[in-house]
């Protein structure tokens, strides 16, 4: 992978990630394909929304279908018929989300399978091996996602263990002679000094890109913005910056304003299945009865298949009847909305008009523009 930085507007960056399997224009949003599929969508449909890269989930793909079946197909690209770049998370976040059915030690994590209760162990080395089997274009290190809230001491211990796991991830990645890219993950909760220590340690090890982890886990938005403003300028300019698990459209806008290059989140797809649709004028809840006889499209400014062909009334009807097509059309729209937002952000950075773009984004939704720190 090669990262090319074209231009900046304030702290925002316009560039691209160049892989053998294709180029990803940045800032980029990655739809989430947890089980090797973006729910309800074919790869062709996902691509038609403008997505250049997908995120796959190491933990879930390891449990089902497993490495052996994956290898029989070649890798995850062949298994799901997506021949463009794929980033896989390390599995750490999912393991730590298991709560009472897992035990964390220095070696790794012991847990019971949420599928059948089987005892399983995952560590940094196993995570690297699974992601190697998946053929991931971007591999993420195995880390502990520090829960929120955490005291300074709790966050420090968690971050320092993540650093030790980061070195083990690097060593195993190199031992496997994996030709793809490895990203480090900056931890430290909401504490700037711990974020500094984490980044310093990761830079000493050396990675192809750097993610900011442990945000959007319940902390106030002000803390997320503060940490991004503190951390992003310290990441080398020639390395991509990835904000993990984020988020709402405004979170993407605020992340880009603070120098983030990559995002992922289940929100556009999950919300689509629940009838929450993102538009240029804010969120539409298609289950609301006021859409029952509305012949207008979801969003007159959207060029997606759904908006070009169907009315709000039809989408309301599909939702009320619990028709699968409704969830699919909603997903197509939400994913396209996210990609159009990223296209708009990239264009604004190119032309030096990001401030105007951001103001229009918030004004159209009747909201004020959040302030950046000096």
From Swiss-Prot:
Substrate binds at residues 89-93, 143, 187, 214. The active site is at 89 (proton acceptor), 264 (nucleophile). GO terms for molecular function: metal ion binding; tRNA-guanosine(34) queuine transglycosylase activity. Pfam families: TGT. Keywords: Glycosyltransferase, Metal-binding, Queuosine biosynthesis, Transferase, tRNA processing, Zinc. Its EC number is 2.4.2.29. It comes from the Bacteria. Disulfide bonds: none annotated. GO terms for biological process: queuosine biosynthetic process; tRNA wobble guanine modification; tRNA-guanine transglycosylation. Its cofactor is Zn(2+). Residues 245-251, 269-273 are annotated as: RNA binding. One of its GO terms (cellular component) is cytosol. It catalyses: 7-aminomethyl-7-carbaguanine + guanosine(34) in tRNA = 7-aminomethyl-7-carbaguanosine(34) in tRNA + guanine. Pathway: tRNA modification; tRNA-queuosine biosynthesis. InterPro entries: ArchSynthase1/Queuine_TRR, TGT, TGT-like_sf, tRNA_ribo_trans-like. Belongs to the queuine tRNA-ribosyltransferase family. Catalyzes the base-exchange of a guanine (G) residue with the queuine precursor 7-aminomethyl-7-deazaguanine (PreQ1) at position 34 (anticodon wobble position) in tRNAs with GU(N) anticodons (tRNA-Asp, -Asn, -His and -Tyr). Catalysis occurs through a double-displacement mechanism. The nucleophile active site attacks the C1' of nucleotide 34 to detach the guanine base from the RNA, forming a covalent enzyme-RNA intermediate. The proton acceptor active site deprotonates the incoming PreQ1, allowing a nucleophilic attack on the C1' of the ribose to form the product. PANTHER family: QUEUINE TRNA-RIBOSYLTRANSFERASE (PTHR46499:SF1). This is Queuine tRNA-ribosyltransferase.
């Amino acid at each position: 992978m090669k990262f090319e930085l074209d231009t900046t507007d304030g702290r925002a960056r316009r560039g691209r990630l160049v892989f053998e399997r294709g180029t990803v224009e940045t800032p980029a949003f990655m739809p989430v394909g947890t089980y090797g599929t973006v729910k309800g969508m074919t790869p062709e449909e996902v691509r038609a929304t403008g997505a250049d890269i997908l995120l796959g989930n190491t933990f879930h793909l390891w449990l089902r279908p497993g490495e052996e079946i994956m290898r029989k197909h070649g890798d995850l690209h062949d298994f799901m018929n997506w021949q463009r770049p794929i980033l896989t998370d390390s599995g750490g976040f999912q393991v730590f989300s298991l709560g009472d059915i897992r035990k964390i030690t220095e070696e790794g994590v012991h847990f019971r399978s949420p599928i059948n209760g089987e005892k399983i162990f995952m560590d940094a080395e196993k995570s690297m091996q699974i992601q190697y089997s998946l053929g991931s274009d971007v591999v993420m290190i195995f880390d502990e996602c520090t829960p929120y809230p955490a005291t300074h001491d709790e966050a420090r211990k968690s971050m320092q263990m993540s650093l030790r796991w980061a070195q083990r991830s690097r060593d195993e990645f190199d031992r496997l002679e994996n030709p793809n890219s490895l990203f480090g993950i900056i931890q430290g909760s909401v504490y700037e000094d711990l974020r500094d220590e984490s980044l310093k340690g990761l830079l000493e090890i050396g990675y192809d890109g750097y993610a900011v982890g442990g945000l959007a886990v319940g902390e106030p938005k002000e803390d997320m913005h503060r940490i991004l403003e503190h951390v992003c300028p310290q990441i080398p300019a020639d390395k991509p910056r990835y904000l993990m698990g984020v988020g709402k459209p405004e979170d993407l806008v605020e992340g880009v304003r603070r120098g983030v290059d990559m995002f992922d989140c289940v929100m556009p797809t999950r919300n689509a299945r629940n009838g929450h649709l993102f538009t240029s004028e804010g969120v539409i809840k298609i289950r609301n009865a006021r859409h029952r006889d509305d012949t207008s499209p979801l969003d007159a400014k959207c060029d997606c298949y759904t908006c070009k062909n169907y009315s709000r009334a039809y989408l309301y009807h599909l939702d009320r009847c619990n028709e699968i097509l409704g969830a699919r059309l909603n997903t197509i729209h939400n994913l396209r909305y996210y990609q159009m937002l990223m296209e708009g952000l990239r264009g604004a950075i190119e032309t030096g008009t990001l401030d105007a773009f951001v103001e229009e984004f918030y004004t159209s939704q009747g909201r004020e523009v959040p302030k950046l720190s000096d």
